[in-house]
Regions:
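A glycine- and small/hydrophobic-rich beta-loop-beta segment
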Residues: 1-38
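Flexible, glycine/charged-enriched surface loops at secondary-structure junctions
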Residues: 30-42, 68-75, 131-134
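A short beta-alpha structural unit
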Residues: 5-12, 37-57, 77, 81-83
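Zn-dependent metallopeptidase/amidohydrolase metal-coordination segment
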Residues: 1, 71-120
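Short glycine-/small-residue-rich flexible loop motifs, especially phosphate/cofactor-binding loops
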Residues: 29, 61, 82-83
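His/Asp/Glu-rich mid-to-C-terminal helical/loop segments that flank catalytic regions of hydrolases
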Residues: 15-16, 21-27, 96-134
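Anion (oxyanion) recognition and catalysis
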Residues: 33, 65, 86
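NTP/phosphate- and nucleic-acid-binding module
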Residues: 61-63, 129
Length: 134
């Protein structure tokens, strides 16, 4: 038989990612030996973790506090547009609550109320950034 799968490894730092990949390779080595199978790997994409701008994060958190919206800092660990924009601009992200935490899948759903809350936080955050520029 043959098995193919894609494994996406994410981490907050390159060191975290490298450590996890090393552990995975060590397990593959054990599997090869124990089961007498061939394991082939291919690195399709290697993206470095991106740290977003803390000044912008502070403006977002201030906006959330002003609107009594709970704040949860979340490391996305996914390649979003923000990770590409961070090369040329100050960048941060606002995550919209989704039902059962589902994201980037057909079951993803955010209520109109949650979208409105996040949109108003974003608007206030933009105004907060604008105040800093004056």
């Amino acid at each position: 038989g043959k098995v193919e799968f894609i494994l996406e490894v994410r981490g907050e730092t390159e060191e975290d990612i490298q450590r996890l990949v090393a552990n995975i390779k060590a397990e593959w080595k054990k599997i090869r030996k124990a089961r007498q199978v061939d394991v082939k790997e291919q690195n399709i994409l290697n993206q470095k973790p991106v740290h977003l701008d803390m000044d912008i994060v502070a403006c977002i958190e201030k906006a959330a506090q002003e609107r009594h919206v709970p704040i949860v800092r979340l490391a996305s660990m996914a390649g979003h547009d923000a990770s590409h924009m961070a090369d040329i601009s100050k960048t941060a992200m606002i995550f919209v609550k989704s039902i059962n935490g589902k994201s980037h899948c057909p079951q993803e759903y955010s209520t109109p109320d949650d979208i409105e809350i996040a949109s108003n936080v974003m608007l206030q955050a933009i105004l907060n950034v604008d105040e800093q520029l004056d």
